[in-house]
């Protein structure tokens, strides 16, 4: 049976979970910062504590859940999990190009540089033209 923590117990539980996790983030696999710089993640539906996470990863988790619920219209957690797995597979598949097409508004690094240089030249020309009076 789950036990509701008192606020004064949060730091001790956060540290205990940090040690249980061997100082590793269960989401990213990265090394966790010291327990005092982590947060005690919990499910906002049930209140159950899940793990000790870095603050940034905890924020990412919440934002992704919110996006999937609101924009992705996920009605239950299993649907959200299915979509996330599908998204990861999709990204992995497309690390190698699957088509020969480039989106019309995409700029290559050379095109970005040319655009920036043209903007700088235009600004210099405008400044020169405006200061000769």
For the regions a language model picked out, list residue spans one by one:
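Short Fe-S-cluster ligation motifs
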Residues: 56-57, 79-104
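Compact, Lys/Arg-rich rRNA/RNP-binding cores from ribosome-related proteins
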Residues: 50, 69-81
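Conserved aromatic-histidine-acidic binding/catalytic patches
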Residues: 9, 13-16, 41, 45, ...
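Charged, low-complexity alpha-helical linker segments
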Residues: 23-26, 127-133
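Short, charged surface segments at domain edges that flank catalytic/cofactor-binding sites
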Residues: 1-24
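Histidine-centered nuclease catalytic patch
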Residues: 24-69
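BZIP DNA-binding basic region
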Residues: 33-39, 43-44, 49, 98-130
């Amino acid at each position: 049976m789950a036990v509701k923590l008192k606020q004064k117990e949060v730091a001790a539980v956060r540290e205990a979970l940090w040690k249980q996790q061997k100082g590793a983030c269960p989401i990213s696999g990265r090394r966790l910062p010291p327990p005092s710089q982590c947060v005690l993640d919990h499910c906002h539906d049930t209140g159950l504590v899940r793990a000790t996470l870095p603050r940034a990863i905890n924020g990412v988790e919440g934002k992704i859940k919110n996006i999937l619920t609101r924009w992705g219209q996920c009605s239950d957690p299993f649907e959200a999990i299915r979509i996330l797995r599908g998204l990861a597979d999709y990204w992995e598949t497309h690390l190698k190009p699957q088509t020969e097409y480039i989106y019309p508004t995409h700029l290559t690094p050379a095109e970005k540089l040319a655009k920036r240089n043209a903007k700088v030249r235009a600004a210099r020309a405008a400044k020169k033209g405006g200061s000769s009076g």
